[in-house]
Amino acid sequence: MFGFEIQPVRSRNWEIEEEEDQEVVSVEIPKPSISFVNDNYKLEFNNNNDTPFNIIVSTNGSPSIFVKGCFESNQFDEIADISYSDIKPLKTTNTNTVLNNKCTVYRHKIEKSMIFITVQYDLPSERCFGFTELVLNTFKNVSQVLVLDKILNTHYLSQNYTHPIPPFTRAIFNSLFKNDYSLTPLESSNIIENLSASFLTICQVKYIPACSILNLYESHLNIESVQSFTPIVKSIYPQLFNNSSLKQEDITSQFKLMINALNKRNDKGMYM
């Protein structure tokens, strides 16, 4: 008589019980720390109750290239660094500071209420809320936050499957931000992540107007994408451009130097 050999099997219930019995090991998320250039800055910001700050946060790549190319050379005072114990800065030349794997905090020399934070390392999503809380707790009296970011960084889920051609920028903002600048909104989002999400969310809770300007991520960056931030930032903070002694050709030259350095690193997979 023919039959099938019965093979012993493992119960799925037993596997579930085994998984439940395993000890869950929690991993502590590294916390950021801020180091001021000198104690005077630390005392000034810790005791400030009068000056409302406008903060511009730029993420790695084209956003930080825009900020550094437009303002860093002669309009910024470096006031602090935001660091993590497991993220090491890299040595770079003066023209390639956009590759230094650091987060530097600047204040505008003339418009002293303007704070710039260039985040030149990639932050995992689980670190973004801690980073945002550190920033907003350091500069307690914040009037508005503007994040310059890339769409890819937000892990934005879209129903629009067309492929826009750069330069391409869209805005996403919390309910407290007044769009008086004709910014083109991104289609209604169902989820965003990382620094744009953390700043928009925490600023909403703290009643701070916040907006994120997003452009495309490009594996080979072009100057048009970097320059696409210019009219937007100029419309929101025109005072930043009124006192600039830099000519447009000088700014463009700075953009090109940093773009070439970034593209060369991406092409060769190495830092300069």
Curated annotation (Swiss-Prot):
Instruction: Name the InterPro entries on file.
Output: Proteasome_assmbl_chp_1
Any idea which GO molecular function terms this record carries? proteasome binding
Pfam families in UniProt? PAC1
Q: Name one GO biological process term.
A: proteasome core complex assembly
The transmembrane residues are: none
Gene Ontology CC entries for this record: endoplasmic reticulum
Keyword Chaperone attributed: yes
Q: What is the official name of this protein in its record?
A: Proteasome assembly chaperone 1
Q: Where does this protein come from, organism-wise?
A: Dictyostelium discoideum (Social amoeba)
Give the classification, highest ranks.
Eukaryota, Amoebozoa, Evosea, Eumycetozoa, Dictyostelia
Q: Which gene encodes it?
A: psmG1
